[in-house]
Amino acid sequence: MMRAIYLLVVVCWAAAANASSDTVPAEVQTIVKTPGHQYDLYKKMVATISLPANANTEIHKGLNIKRPDNKVTKADIELYYWHKDLKYAVTKFLHLINDDGNKEELTAEEFSNDLQKLAFKVALVECHYQLSPGLRQACYADEILTYGALVLESDDITKFYKHLDNDKDNELKTEEVLKIQHTHKNKDNKIVAEELGAYSGAKKDTVTPEEFEEYVTQESIVDDFRECRSKKATEGTTDYDNVCLTNELVEYVNDDLTEIDISLLYRSVDTNNDNKIIIDELKAFTGITDDVKAKRILELLDMSATTPANAKPVVDYGEWRTYLRSPTVLLQLERDCAMKHNDQLEEINCMYKLLKNLLIDEHDPIWLEAWDLDHVILFEIFDADKDDGKVFKDDLKKIQKNFHFKTEATVTRYMVEADIDKDSFICLEEFDEYMDIPHMVYGTGECILHSRTKPDERGDCFVEETSDVVDNFKFIENAAFDTWFNHYDTNHNNKIEKEADGLLAKFNNDANVLTMFLEETGQGGLTVEPFEFNWYVKQQHLAHAYEDEKIVTALVQKFTAEQITKLHTELIKYINDEMTERDIEDLFDELDHNDDHELTQQDFPDCWNDVKDLLTHIDALIPEGDEDTTVNYLEFWAWINHPNPKKPQELIKKTFETDCTTKHATQKEEVACYVKTFKTKDKFKTA
């Protein structure tokens, strides 16, 4: 995901002087180096996740669409699915959850044993933090069905294992893992061998078929495998491409935050090894000496809805895992650590150091990001009757007066936009997706600092801002963006590629403009995927531009050829003439020589005196930041979009645009010019 898209929720590191170590404790280093011990730790951690005694009953209620017959049938599950690509899995799920693959109905008791499996427990843990019974039931049902629909079956796993086990002796050895053939460049399988070997419960550098099956059915990896299904799978059969599965496995272990990573990091902080991170352990980890701040961090991490107000906050494994897997934290851990290291201990040490800095920084997602928990709180305010985990139009009408939905027309429009599957109600999954679109991320950002312990206060802010966004933006449906993307996909292969037939002509045969377009929308490469294009053109700035130009005047389901021509003109104008979000990010990265996500004296060894005053000024723009001449990305972005002291009628970015944006044909030239302009101190006098 682009940093520009998540500007308000982006992780920004703050400088913090503390005495805590930047490496994991010695005990954890020993665990990393000893085959099998990591897996033992992971099993121990997951075993601490305690599902409520009535979890199987709540799952049953969530799935039992045809209540009150108290039996979950195949028809119930078919009704439950609105995911088009999961419908094939109904029979597969029933086969997974009970021993009789032909059985087409289940009682609540038949869920009990399966819910104790490691992967199921991990998949369900986040549902504990739902507040109302109806919403918790819906969450349980959705998680268990989604996991059950995607997980590989035993026959597929056996074929996958044999594909990797070259000598067919049912022992996948380190040397065999190291020789795995895959298409990913710069991945040497070392860390794959380390993690798979560590997962072996036999304390040896081989992995048995049983151990392998347990690994590849982890909740966090199964979704990666879904694209490896053949088209036959959608018709009810299972057929997987083993080469694709191999590539996904290599990429997961190399580039993703794995379950073993999460358990190692938890153990690194929970030094008492009692499955409770308490205030003293957090202070030792972060180096924080302020009890008030340390307690506040623990309160934000402690997501249990049942924790009494006067109780001491503690963080269990499920809450820790939920925090690490929140979108922005996950992005940072994977991008800055997992993707940059091919040694497991180096990777864990990197994550350990990064997490320490994240928790210290008051601009970290723990302080600023709308977590899923925030969406749950807001969803439950919207769900006025609190009985079914669904928001109907009547629910919104009930809260209209109290929570500032301005008119009934606003309520109607909100239902049209957020009800993705058009079944006349909004479920949590639809609501969460709607609240994550850039318009809403920006519009509701200021609400996030409201106390999480006062849902009504936070909810009031969210609903009011949501109403404003709904009233003031002309939303464009995803299908419309597909038509715009298709305008550039001249080879009709679901990619925008520089050498595609006819593409250059759409840019008036100007190769420089085409290259800039590809570099911007594709985040650096010269091939643009649909999701990259869609995220780019949904930026808040561009959304305003569409409306200012009267391109979009109502809810749009499909762009016309005339609209696409206007949209293209506006987009190219933005890329060519303005300092874009991508430009700001590239400038920051170019100035950040030591790649520590902050600008300090170390980044300016030859011109510190020229930029010291400017950095001090930038750091002071956001009062919550430490005024120590250390500038993180959020502060830097705020300065770029701040009025110029020399020309108050213009934003700082105007100087960069005048000096660079309109004068250079390539992104590299532009960024080099931005750097030169930044280091010219007279451009931005702060006195």
Swiss-Prot record:
Keywords: Calcium, Metal-binding, Repeat, Secreted, Signal. SUPFAM superfamilies: EF-hand (SSF47473). The keyword Calcium applies. GO terms for cellular component: extracellular region. Residues 1-19 form the signal peptide. Ca(2+) binds at D592, N594, D596, E598, D603. It is found in: Secreted. GO terms for molecular function: calcium ion binding. Residues 152-187, 257-292, 406-441, 476-511, 579-614 form the EF-hand domain. Expressed in salivary glands where expression is strongest in type III cells in the posterior lobe of the principal glands (at protein level). Not expressed in midgut, Malpighian tubules or epidermis. It comes from the Eukaryota. Binds calcium. During feeding of the phloem sap, protein is injected into sieve tubes of rice plants. This process may suppress the sieve-element clogging and facilitate continuous ingestion from sieve tubes. This is Calcium-binding protein SP84.
